[in-house]
């Protein structure tokens, strides 16, 4: 997970940041029913803090557009932020917190038992995850 900030924001120069250092900033977040918003609210509750929300949007592209327009900063998956940073003036600052490293798994009973299109999907997801871990993207 990263903190997305406008490219010219003072925090854009940081190598990383703790989530606790961002909660008092104006935030752009996904809608309340989203998993990421619920998780951030849970983290804030554990810290006895409230996330300072400026606006809630429906997707990461909209969040990045709001960040680019200096409406606020946004916590989001690194892959989403970097994808939009290619076309928008935003910077991605990695979060230092342990919880910010997400491990995603693909679970199937039998990979060999899947239809070819499903195996292709699993292969694509695994390749994308490996590329993201190396800081690359796949087409």
PLM regions: where:
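A late-sequence structural motif
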Residues: 12, 91-134
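Hydrophobic hinge/microswitch elements
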Residues: 29-91
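Generic preference for hydrophobic
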Residues: 3-4, 27, 75, 92, ...
């Amino acid at each position: 997970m990263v903190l997305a900030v406008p490219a010219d924001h003072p925090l854009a120069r940081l190598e990383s940041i703790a989530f606790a250092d961002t909660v008092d900033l104006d935030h752009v977040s996904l809608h309340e029913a989203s998993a990421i918003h619920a998780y951030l609210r849970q983290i804030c509750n554990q810290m006895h803090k409230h996330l300072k929300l400026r606006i809630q949007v429906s997707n990461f592209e909209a969040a990045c557009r709001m960040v680019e327009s200096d409406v606020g900063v946004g916590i989001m998956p690194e892959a989403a932020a970097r994808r939009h940073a290619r076309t928008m003036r935003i910077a991605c600052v990695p979060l230092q917190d342990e919880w910010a490293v997400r491990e995603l798994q693909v679970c199937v009973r039998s990979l060999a038992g899947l239809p070819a299109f499903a195996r292709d999907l699993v292969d694509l997801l695994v390749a994308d995850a490996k590329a993201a871990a190396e800081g690359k993207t796949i087409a």
